Each structure stands twice: as structure tokens, then as C-alpha cells.
């Protein structure tokens, strides 16, 4: 019946695959209206083609400028942080040979066999340490004076725990310069950082590979279940500095409302609906 009107929220996510096909087949004559802040236009996923009349795009548009004007959101400002460890995706093999020259031969070959990828390059320990230091120095200048907080977006779950360790060490070293005892500084720095990521079925499995076993142990140590994640997000939105940072890779990138979050440090390519 054409009397049916279907309102689809977050329509870029649900209507291209089975759910959308079943819904259209069930209500073939219904009028569909889609709502999204991040429409997608790709060969295999086209929000405009799914919901718009031929040759049209939006029926109505309420953009970021409108939301800022109405004070529904705040302006988004982008600042590039170029370093010697910036990654050009076209030169991944060259960067691998240059950056991993001091890594033991067996470990370097193991990485090469897995495939030299953007993620492998991004997780170089020296690169992570340098960026963690840059994040902390920037955070002290921009966020800390006004008790603002920040997210760090890493490329994957492994890089989350790598960033946590590097940032904890940087913060602890700074606290020790201010006279705090080492054990207290390390503990305090650890409490200033929370990691939010999804669990994998592989996390609890033993491995004969020492690197994989260590990674799984780190992921297990810093994983937050549903209650732990709720508590971390509540504390993050609160006034204290524990935590001051949320480190994520996929979660909390969109739809997470925290007025005291001032900066999102991006070390992951984000595109289309993953960006806003």
C-alpha cells in the first residue's frame, strides 16, 4: 500500500544489504524517507540512489554549519601534525625497509611475510613513541589548562595497547619530573588512560608465538566489558583527570557526546560515515 511511510534513521548503514532488501520486498509500495548525517556514494553502496529521485540528492539538508549556527554542535577545526613518521601509502615498502632496519632479522621477515601494510608501518614502536610524546605536549597546552579531555584514534586493537604503553610512559616521566615517585607516577599515568575496543574470539587462546601471546595478554588486561566501558565513559565525561584519554580504533567515533572532549587525535584513515 502507498499509505505506508517508512522513516529510516542512519539509513546509510542498514538499507543496502539483506535488511534493506527484505524491507523493500515486504513493503514494495511504501514511501521511504532516509535520515543520515553521512550519506555514501559508491558503486556498491549509494544512499542517494536508494532514497532519492533520479537526478536528485537531498530532499532537505541540515548541515554542520546549520548545527553550529543553532548551537546544536560546536565548530570542528582540523590541525595537521606532520612529523618525520608521516606515512605516504604509495611508499609503504620503502618506509618498511627504512624504519625497520634495526629490527631483528627474524622478526622483520615475519612481518614481511604477513604483508607490509599501512597498519604494520603505523605500529612501528619509534613512531608510536614519538606521536605519544607529541600528543602529550599538545594536550598539556591545549586541553589540560581548562580540564578538557581527548580521544586517540588508533589504526587497530594492537595499536591501542601500544599507544597506551607509550603514552603512560611519557606521562609518568613528566609526573616524575614534578617530584612524584616512580611507582606512583606510573600508576597515576595508567589511570589517566582508558582503552575502549571490542573483544575477539582469539584473545583468550594460547599461542606459541611470544609476540602474539604478549599482545593477547595486553588486550585482555585492558579490555573493558559493558559495565567497565560505561564506567569509563561516565568518568571521562566527569570533572576528574582519570581518565583524561580514551584510546579507541572503531568504537566511539560517532554518536559519542562528551562536551568536555576538546581534541580527537587521529592516527587512522577515516572516510565517509566513519569520519563524523
Regions found by a protein language model. Give the residues of each.
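Short secondary-structure boundary/capping segments
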Residues: 21-23, 46-53, 93-94, 166-171, ...
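SF2 helicase catalytic motif II
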Residues: 1-33
Amino acid at each position: 500500500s502507498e499509505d505506508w511511510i517508512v522513516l529510516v534513521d542512519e539509513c546509510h548503514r542498514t538499507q543496502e544489504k539483506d535488511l534493506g532488501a527484505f524491507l523493500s520486498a515486504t513493503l514494495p509500495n511504501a514511501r521511504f524517507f532516509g535520515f543520515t548525517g553521512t550519506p555514501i556514494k559508491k558503486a556498491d553502496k549509494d544512499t542517494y540512489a536508494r532514497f532519492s529521485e533520479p537526478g536528485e540528492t537531498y530532499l532537505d539538508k541540515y548541515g554542520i554549519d546549520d548545527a553550529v549556527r543553532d548551537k546544536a554542535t560546536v565548530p570542528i577545526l582540523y590541525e595537521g601534525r606532520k612529523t618525520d613518521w608521516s606515512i605516504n601509502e604509495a611508499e609503504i615498502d620503502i618506509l618498511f625497509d627504512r624504519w625497520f632496519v634495526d629490527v631483528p632479522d627474524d622478526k622483520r621477515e615475519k612481518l614481511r611475510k604477513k604483508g607490509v601494510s599501512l597498519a604494520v608501518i603505523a605500529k612501528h614502536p619509534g613512531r608510536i613513541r614519538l606521536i605519544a610524546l607529541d600528543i602529550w605536549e599538545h594536550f598539556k597546552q591545549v586541553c589540560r589548562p581548562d580540564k578538557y579531555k581527548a580521544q586517540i584514534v588508533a589504526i587497530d586493537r594492537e595499536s591501542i595497547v601500544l599507544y597506551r604503553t607509550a603514552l603512560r610512559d611519557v606521562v609518568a616521566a613528566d609526573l616524575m619530573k614534578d617530584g612524584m615517585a616512580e611507582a606512583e607516577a606510573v600508576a597515576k599515568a595508567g589511570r589517566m588512560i582508558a582503552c575502549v575496543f571490542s573483544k575477539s574470539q582469539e584473545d583468550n587462546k594460547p599461542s606459541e608465538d611470544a609476540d602474539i601471546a604478549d599482545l593477547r595478554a595486553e588486550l585482555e588486561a585492558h579490555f573493558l566489558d559493558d559495565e567497565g566501558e560505561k564506567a569509563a565513559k561516565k568518568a571521562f565525561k566527569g570533572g576528574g583527570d582519570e581518565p583524561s584519554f580514551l584510546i579507541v580504533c572503531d568504537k566511539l567515533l560517532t554518536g559519542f557526546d562528551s562536551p568536555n572532549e576538546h581534541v580527537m587525535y587521529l592516527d587512522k584513515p577515516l572516510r565517509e560515515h566513519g569520519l563524523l
